């Protein structure tokens, strides 16, 4: 299963969910869905915006874990 490590990167950047939401242009509700792993899919455009806002690589945000 793919796990999002958005909270880890947010902590490293000392950024709140609200700040990230504003930078990326995603609602808090949708960002929370991504953060909690409840999202079924993520658009490449969204991943690109997250990486730009958090100054990181996609591999910093995504991690595969065995079920």
Mark where each language-model region is.
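A short, Lys/Arg-rich alpha-helix, primarily the initiator
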Residues: 1-16
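Short, charged recognition helix plus adjacent turn
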Residues: 8, 28, 33, 40, ...
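DNA major-groove recognition helix of helix-turn-helix/homeodomain DNA-binding modules
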Residues: 45-60
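Short alpha-helical elements of helix-turn-helix
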Residues: 3-4, 43-47
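Short alpha-helical DNA-recognition segment
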Residues: 15-33
